[in-house]
Amino acid sequence: MPDNSSIANCCAASGLAARPSWPGSAEAEPPETPRAPWVAPMLSTVVIVTTAVDFVGNLLVILSVLRNRKLRNAGNLFVVNLALADLVVALYPYPLILVAILHDGWVLGEIHCKASAFVMGLSVIGSVFNITAIAINRYWCICHSATYHRACSQWHAPLYISLIWLLTLVALVPNFFVGSLEYDPRIYSCTFIQTASTQYTMAVVAIHFLLPIAVVSFCYLRIWILVLQARRKAKAERKLRLRPSDLRSFLTMFAVFVVFAICWAPLNCIGLAVAINPEAMALQIPEGLFVTSYFLAYFNSCLNAIVYGLLNQNFRREYKRILSALWSTGRCFHDASKCHLTEDLQGPVPPAAMATIPVQEGAL
């Protein structure tokens, strides 16, 4: 899936940046049209909220699976892997985007620019492949339960996860040969420039978005058909052995897929349209639409943990336990520090006062 800055380097018109370049360089050009004063505060708020929810939410997902034995299964290892893919952008690229917004330009140098763009791509493509793997896992678990445990045990899952990240790295390699990693001032982000090759951009959209969407849609469609058959016929239900936990897991991951598709579809549609007809489409796409589609895609990284909490009772229960434990620990530290502070303010009890305190008989 492309970070579609395929219109980032097009001619400056309709308020589009003429060419991403480093601040202070000889090639740097000011934007044709200044931004509205509310744009930077709004984008910074979106980035801060997304980063905070992403960090806390995905940590809760990981801790929930590690703590709860009911959640510690082969299927949820892919969920943890997806949470890690979402978490990594909250640790590196998003804070750098916030710095760029606050400085109204990139001030962290070329190395951080290229590295943040690479990490962003790693997270996005890793998420796509993880969601696809989860759909295949759910399909196999529900539709082919007889062979599921032989092929998808907890010992096999790490191999599949390693394969996912290997394919993710392979998918990122062509970007270093086809185009460069540069800063796009419209989205305050360093991203992959897709103008070098129309064919490459179309291939990226097809392989990283359309193909996974097709595979996931097929898997979930087959599951829906079998679920409906199981509800209508008691015999089919016995054959399928549909457990409530399997259905809950399926519905949760189906919701994750729908949210992902909604968040990333606008940006990929823009990239595909520009790839098909770059000269005509690049100038017709409003900058506001492009920026909105980009930040909608960024926002997706914090939504999965919310979906788990809303739709999966085991995750919701574990969230409450973790947050309650953290709250209790925080109160203990607060009460202890308050107690020590009171003792320090009152000072030691003088001997004369000690003498006036009656000692009860038998007291220790």
Swiss-Prot record:
Gene Ontology CC terms: plasma membrane
Tissue-level expression: Expressed in the hippocampus, kidney, and ovary.
Membrane spanning stretches: 46-66, 82-102, 116-136, 159-179, 201-221, 256-276, 288-308
UniProt source species: Rattus norvegicus
Domain of life where this protein originates: Eukaryota
Function: High affinity receptor for melatonin. The activity of this receptor is mediated by pertussis toxin sensitive G proteins that inhibits adenylate cyclase activity.
Lipid bilayer topology: Multi-pass membrane protein
Localisation: Cell membrane
Cytoplasmic side: 67-81, 137-158, 222-255, 309-364
GO molecular function: G protein-coupled receptor activity; melatonin receptor activity
Lineage of origin: Eukaryota, Metazoa, Chordata, Craniata, Vertebrata
Protein name (Swiss-Prot/TrEMBL): Melatonin receptor type 1B
UniProt record, GO biological process: camera-type eye development; G protein-coupled receptor signaling pathway; glucose homeostasis; negative regulation of cGMP-mediated signaling; negative regulation of cytosolic calcium ion concentration; negative regulation of insulin secretion; negative regulation of neuron apoptotic process; negative regulation of transmission of nerve impulse
Alphabetized UniProt keyword annotations: Cell membrane, Disulfide bond, G-protein coupled receptor, Membrane, Receptor, Signal, Transducer, Transmembrane, Transmembrane helix
